[in-house]
Amino acid sequence: MIALRTDFSAKEGPVKPMNAVNNGPAGSAVRQTGNFEAYKEAGFPYARLHDSAFYGGYGGDLSVDVHRIFRNFDADADDPASYIFEPTDEYLSNIAAAGTRIFYRLGAAIEHNYKLGTYPPKDYLKWAKICEHIIRHYNEGWANGFFFGIEYWEIWNEFDCRNQDGSHPCWQGTFSEFAEFYSVAARYLKGRFPHLRIGGPAFASIWDEAAADAFFKVMRRDNVPFDFLSYHAYMSTVKSFRDTVAQANKVFSAYGYGKTEKILNEWNYVKGWTADLWRYSLRTEKGLKGASFAAACMAEGQRSDLDMLMYYDARPCGMNGLFDTDFLQPLKGYYAFKAFSALRELGTCARTETESEELCACAATDGRTHRLLFTRFCDEDAAQTETVKIAVKGVSGPVKATVYATDEARSMAPLREEVFTAEEFALYLQAELFGIYLVEIVPVRQGGENGRTDGHL
């Protein structure tokens, strides 16, 4: 038996946006096969724009990236005619219509093969001025633009990324060149938009000491402002997730940025990047095990010194564990994010304690409705069902507890209900490995067990 204790009277701050993603709703308006309604219902708080150009439904080769919007670097940066905004306009409008806020990555999509947009700009300041106009288009209406109020603007992506063959898919210059480029761009943009959150650099690996040292030495020399620091991590265990977050905080603190907002804005289950391990990783991401890993990491992120977590990827691709890529129907991973969104609806995190490394949990309350999300995850492929004793305190009875399960047979479907009259009680549940469980506790208003309740999942 595994014990899980939850005290809804012990408040631990706001439920953080651990269920943010990369990219927005997908599908064909012509064919009417999109996932817009499901995407909207999931309640993703933010969508980061990265690798968006790889999907035609987002505008393809004409969308998001700086070199795709401003296609001739020698053109006049002040002339609206130098920009192609329309494909990105449509994409961002769809994200905003879904109720998801936009997190705009300024730079280029990853380039594993032919290199076009990942070369160092030949004029760093002009590149920053081009970005200024992109920001003004989407936030201030410039060039027949919009007023989206996009707060987060990230400079570049994974300058430190290296493939096994030694090639660099995201930055064709040196680490030092990138640091100089970033310094110019960040200082210029922050000077133009002091009210916005300007940050980066989306480290591929926070464990690369040479990259971090080259970058932060220039940042400190130039007193570069950071509204947030971003980094990426792919792993196959919750311990690796926890260790990576701790390493990032250690590195940032060592260079004097320990109190800066920290965002892990690419992550997913990856056991290996090549051959059979890569194929296994992709299969896992799209199944229940990948969904359990996502739920576990979101719960762990909530209790970590981390401000936002952004899953890669909601774009139709091999690493999308949220929607299938043929018909855009929800996969098991979708329900992990929808369940975490149910916690964010309540606003305030409540204390949880577990006795097992394989049990990850997070709880939330608004003072009347209480919800607990937990999953059993370990990096194995089979294990016995375990009894989980859920000890609950800090509620006012009588209450009805409803358990929603996501497993191989169910997708966030009601599993059982039980009424409790005491302020402290225990609920026993047979929990499968990789099962994801959301417990909702609501007051019973009148009529006892068959009376009305306030639940609405």
Please place each PLM-identified region on the residue numbering.
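Mature N-terminal, pre-catalytic/accessory segment of carbohydrate-active enzymes
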Residues: 1-38, 42, 446-457
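Conserved, mostly hydrophobic/aromatic
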Residues: 21, 95, 134, 153, ...
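Short, acidic/polar
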Residues: 27-39, 209-219, 291-298
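Substrate-binding cleft and catalytic face of glycoside hydrolase catalytic domains
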Residues: 42-236
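Glycoside hydrolase catalytic-domain groove-lining segments
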Residues: 230-278
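Aromatic/acidic polysaccharide-binding cleft in carbohydrate-active enzymes
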Residues: 268-360
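Carbohydrate-binding surface patches
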Residues: 355-397, 433-440, 447-448
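C-terminal beta-strand-rich structural cap/linker in extracellular carbohydrate-active enzymes
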Residues: 420-457
